[in-house]
UniProtKB/Swiss-Prot annotation:
Identification of the protein by name: Small ribosomal subunit protein eS28
Domain of life (superkingdom): Eukaryota
Protein encoded by which gene: RpS28
Keyword presence, Endoplasmic reticulum: yes
Lineage per the UniProt record: Eukaryota, Metazoa, Ecdysozoa, Arthropoda, Hexapoda
Entries under CDD domains matching the protein: S1_S28E
Organism encoding this protein: Bombyx mori
Cellular location(s): Cytoplasm, Cytosol; Cytoplasm; Rough endoplasmic reticulum
The family this protein is said to belong to: Belongs to the eukaryotic ribosomal protein eS28 family.
Principal subcellular localisation of the protein: cytoplasm
Record flagged with keyword Cytoplasm: yes
Cellular component GO terms held in the UniProt record: cytoplasmic side of rough endoplasmic reticulum membrane; cytosolic small ribosomal subunit; ribosome
Pfam family, one: Ribosomal_S28e
Length: 65
């Protein structure tokens, strides 16, 4: 349970999600790993190039339709 936090850089902002558009779906690339990319939902302001601290690095969000 003592997994370290993981840093990830926002590669692309995909769109808004949530019932009222309160979350932003982004594609992130892990820093320090071999170009692994996943999709996450982010709450709050975010843009390309931002660095996020992920508490869970294995969870991936479902794609927007």
């Amino acid at each position: 349970m003592d997994k370290p936090n993981v840093l990830a850089r926002v590669v692309k902002v995909l769109g808004r999600t949530g019932s009222q558009g309160q979350c932003t779906q982004v594609k992130v690339e892990f820093i320090g790993e071999t170009s692994r990319q996943i999709i996450r939902n982010v709450k709050g302001p975010v843009r390309d190039g931002d660095i996020l601290t992920l508490l869970e690095s294995e969870r991936e969000a479902r794609r927007l339709r």
